Amino acid sequence: MELSGRLQAVASLVTAGHRIADIGTDHAYIPIFLVQEGRSDSAIAMDVNEGPLKKAEEHVKESGMEGRIEMRLSDGLEKLEPGEADTAVIAGMGGPLMLRILKAYPKTVGSLRELVLQPQSETAKVRAFLLEEGFLFLREELVKEDGKYYPMMKVVPPHDGSLGSPEKDGENRKEPVRQEIRPENQDAEDSREPGCGKPETPDVWDETEVRYGKLLLEMRHPVLREYLLREEAIRLQILDGLLGQSGERITGRKRELEEELEYIRKGLKHYAV
């Protein structure tokens, strides 16, 4: 099976040999691809809607993988028991929905060896949540497809039972986000690739890195540079259109744009020779 560039990038983040749970599977393209390619022995394809799940089941049967890919009607991780999968893939959904799923099933999330996440919106909020909860970032990727930019990440959840603990509820991050990174034996080879974290070193993410991805900035990802330059041009154009205008609303909008430009330019400094 051939995947789109976005789905190919998502699939490439999954560790070979892992049992897969694809949450919001839609057409089941990722589970089919991973099993067909020998990257995974088995997979569970899950979706909250019967229509997409039925279509996914048809694709699985057409691929001849029905004995190795199980279909489940499930709201997020609801029907996945702890220990049933090594990797959860959650791709192609908005950031707020992704966060709701991660927060709703902390025991299941904490039982996973890794998660591969590809939020369609509010990526910075997803990164901030993961860092605050103690997830370890192993890899980040950014793909441009049909004029849109798709960030994705491979993370390891904390395995100390701290996910969803009451003392973390309502935390409001004001200081730089700190991530204590520990070695993960199963990803030792992964950690030497571009876009990977450094599991042996304590890490700190500032606001710019949370917005755009610390690992992407560290590797000077070319697609991220293109994205930042585009975002800079858009905001400069808007500011130019506000020239000569006044009023409280206009002043507030200008201030907002200038703050965004400051972060964009901090990101672009990583590409300076």
Residue positions per predicted region:
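C-terminal substrate-binding/active-site "lid" region of AdoMet-derived donor-dependent transferases
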Residues: 104-157
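S-adenosyl-L-methionine
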Residues: 1-18, 32, 50-83
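Conserved class I S-adenosyl-L-methionine
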Residues: 17-26
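Conserved SAM-binding motif I beta-strand of class I
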Residues: 42-47
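An accessory alpha-helical subdomain
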Residues: 158-169, 174, 187-273
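Short SAM/SAH-binding signature in class I
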Residues: 84-92
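Conserved SAM-binding loop of SAM-dependent methyltransferases across substrates and taxa
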Residues: 27-40
